[in-house]
Amino acid sequence: MDLAAARQRVEELRRLIEEHNYRYYVLDQPSISDREYDALMQELIALEEAYPELRTPDSPSQRVGGAPREEFNQVRHPQVLLSLNDAFNEGDLLEFDRRVRDLAGRPVEYVIEAKIDGLAVALTYRDGLFTLGATRGDGQVGEEVTANLKTIPALPLRLRRPLPFLVVRGEVYMPKVAFTALNAAREEAGEPLFANPRNAAAGSLRQLDPKITASRSLSLFVYQVISLTGAEVATQAGALDFLAELGFPVNPYRVVAPDIQAVLEEVKAWTPERRASLPYEIDGLVIKVNDLALHSVLGATAKAPRWAMAYKFPAEQATARVEGIILRVGRTGVLTPTAVLTPVRLAGTTVSRATLHNEDYIREKDIRIGDTVIVQKAGDIIPEVVAVIPERRTGSEEVFTMPERCPACGAAVVRPPGEAAHRCTGGLACPAQVLEGIIHFASRGAMDIQGLGPAIVAQLLEAGLIHDAADLYYLKEEDLLKLERFGQQSASNLLAAIAASKKQPLERLIFALGIRNVGQRAARVLADHFGSLDKLAAATVEELTALPDIGPRIAENIREFFGEPRNRAVLEKLKKAGVRLEALNAAAPAGPLTGKVFVLTGTLPGMTRQEAEELITRAGGKVSSSVSRKTDYVVAGEKPGSKLDRARELGVPVINADGLRQLLRQ
């Protein structure tokens, strides 16, 4: 393919991918499968790698990339991003309406919108291209998070209609499903949990490494035009329609209310059940004057506009009695305590269980069996015990202690130093760990075996048809037909999905194995470096820790995993079953920087961080986020950070952008 043909195909692929992004994330009407979408993206990436001159900042391939940053730059907003005054009851809303009508001198129409519980951001577009994204901060100054925002698939990198200049305001949020999955993964790893989706969204967007942000499944709703050149909007309802036409994700809930009485009726219609049914968290409603011309008439205080008010939902809490505390054993052996409660209605559902996270949480709140406690849904999702009512105690309450033996297999339970979690040491001899491990192996982010959910895995284990993940590849149709709810078609579909998973990339297999602390990013690093499972299994701790982002703890976990005879037996069965154990690019040619580890710091003249990282990796080098004795070069640009000081302390060679170019030419 020559350059002209490549350019034409790249433009076509970009148009197709952005159209599918719009249909999926904005319209919620996907028209192709995930596999078809991935094929388009991989073709685009391959063409841009073959023809680097065709790569542009607004290409869909550029959503994820760039080296980790040392700190965020401060950005002054061109217009102050005010917060909102809160209303907690009908009287507050009536008083708001009275003030608005007094200042306006006439009846006023309102728009009611959902108050998304996330992190406010300002997005700037020039000539239709996304050029700058910043957090709200204190309203006047925020943090520049452009690279991180680009990783959110719902955010358009190019508007569907080019405008000279546009600044909009939106809310980055984490869907409930993503929040539950993130906390489950953190709990398994013994890491602190996020209290609610809002904290998770804020913490994920403010990661110095955009790749971590990309892994957190963030989404976005845009709800306000701050500054606009090249078009006009007259009402807030019209502004929302205008934003949707430009390709922004706009929340589907919107009600135009002719007066405050209609607003009050709509507020009453928001039952706990309705709120709980949403796939994302809202903590209230926002009532805005619809006529934008009135906004300047009404003005603002130093803190908030006079033309809007946030109605906050009352907290959803209930009291319940702790009937008992049970333990769930996860795939890595983490024991998670759960309170068994007297059933109570909360946020539209009946709650009879609540997470207690770990022993430290139980001790901190002094939760005992028999206590009367206050329960709430953290982010309307996970019920948790937030407080004990000590005056309800009778003296018969029991203090809970973590067991010395695993309730599932009887193996010893230990609490590793520096971790909040207690772990079962039974490994693959523990049936609970085997169950959770196979569920993880088949999950979407791992081997992606469609149709193999937790219930079917449990069924297969109970029937003795499988004992580990590798046994899945030896199942026969007659085995499945013996099970309940399995017919000819469902058995055939599952076996086809299992067979298809044999061709998954090596990085997915490494992640699927469930090695402690080896997430998707670490799995990718390991697959890229070693190229095969056999080479990874033979790697020493020293070889592993020489890799970017593989620390001593992960290295020890990898060695421990491959040193376990049961795990080696599983790997042998996978190999015999025909599961791909090698990377497709295992024989990639060496380059001038092969084996060299680089760290980037400061602003590099003539190239972006992302471009520098790509040049290094294409030449066979590795880019790390931190300086160590294993770092070969630190590439320092303007205004370098603490990494330069660390390099000097360790005697690591420091070069500039020209020095990097010279190495690349060797």
Curated annotation (Swiss-Prot):
GO terms for molecular function: DNA binding; DNA ligase (NAD+) activity; metal ion binding. Its EC number is 6.5.1.2. GO terms for cellular component: cytosol. It catalyses: NAD(+) + (deoxyribonucleotide)n-3'-hydroxyl + 5'-phospho-(deoxyribonucleotide)m = (deoxyribonucleotide)n+m + AMP + beta-nicotinamide D-nucleotide. It comes from the Bacteria. Its cofactor is Mg(2+); Mn(2+). It is an enzyme of class 6 (ligase). This is DNA ligase. It comes from Moorella thermoacetica (strain ATCC 39073 / JCM 9320). The lineage of its organism: Bacteria, Bacillati, Bacillota, Clostridia, Moorellales.
